[in-house]
Design a protein with these regions (language model features):
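Long insertion/accessory domains within large nucleic-acid-processing enzymes
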Residues: 1-128
Length: 128
């Protein structure tokens, strides 16, 4: 004997424009239950690149959810700390206070750099 299939379109459909973000990574939450974002995966990225839509790809992957700006020390290449009281940037490694470059990078990249620094691995950004 047969039973009715309970999968209905209204239970499956999901979309969103703006919604909750994960505090740690600053990226959209996962899943329909959490009103999460739709994943723009590797195959979708490769398809857009092959069609020559590089600005669209950068906008979806980087600008829409993950952009972050930092100041990088030109002497040692590490991300500089910012002092709110004195309104200055300071490199804690080489005590530099003047020679910095403004860099925009994904927040996930900055998070990975910080995790590597906790393991005593110093990734350096070379700016020219």
């Amino acid at each position: 004997f047969y039973q009715r299939l309970k999968h209905m379109v209204n239970d499956k459909q999901h979309s969103r424009s703006i919604g909750p973000m994960v505090n740690l990574t600053r990226q959209p939450a996962e899943g329909r239950a959490r009103d999460g974002g739709l994943r723009f995966g590797e195959m979708e990225r490769d398809c857009m690149i092959s069609h020559g839509a590089s600005r669209f790809t950068k906008g979806r992957i980087y600008d829409a959810s993950d952009t972050f700006s930092v100041h990088v020390c030109n002497k040692c290449g590490l991300i500089a700390a910012y002092n709110d009281v004195e309104n200055i940037h300071l490199c804690k490694t080489c005590e530099n206070r003047t020679d910095f470059s403004y860099v925009e990078l994904p927040y996930s990249c900055k998070l990975m750099f910080q995790e590597l620094l906790t393991m005593n691995i110093a990734p350096r950004l070379i700016t020219e």
